[in-house]
Amino acid sequence: MERLKSHRDFVAVLKRRRRVSREDIVVHYLMHDDVVTGDTATVQGRRVGLAVSKAVGNAVTRNAVKRRFRVLARKYESLLPESCDIVLRAKPSAARADFLSLEQQMASCFEAVKRKTASRQ
């Protein structure tokens, strides 16, 4: 799984306003066939970006949340459609959530994305 790196890619995903939300996680998604113009249309495979704001906590806390999200995204990436961009956004409560809870939420979100995009493939 590749990473979303550029601001343009993040904005493209967030602009589409397609998302799935749980207690501590919001998953924004964009199918590559949704993109009309831009560099994103030429990319194949899944790409994931992380958005953890200062509202989540200090730098140490934010980095811990990002590490957890990366591990969980790798674990459940097979649930996602082949050609999509995902932005995982942490809600402030994610800092206090235990790993098992985050794992269940991530699996649930990725399943929901898969269901919502199944008709498009």
Swiss-Prot record:
Protein known as: Ribonuclease P protein component
Keyword Lyase belongs to the record: no
UniProt keywords, alphabetically: Endonuclease, Hydrolase, Nuclease, RNA-binding, tRNA processing
The enzyme's E.C. designation: 3.1.26.5
UniProt-listed SUPFAM superfamilies: Ribosomal protein S5 domain 2-like
GO cellular component, one term: ribonuclease P complex
Known role: RNaseP catalyzes the removal of the 5'-leader sequence from pre-tRNA to produce the mature 5'-terminus. It can also cleave other RNA substrates such as 4.5S RNA. The protein component plays an auxiliary but essential role in vivo by binding to the 5'-leader sequence and broadening the substrate specificity of the ribozyme.
Annotated organism of origin: Bifidobacterium adolescentis (strain ATCC 15703 / DSM 20083 / NCTC 11814 / E194a)
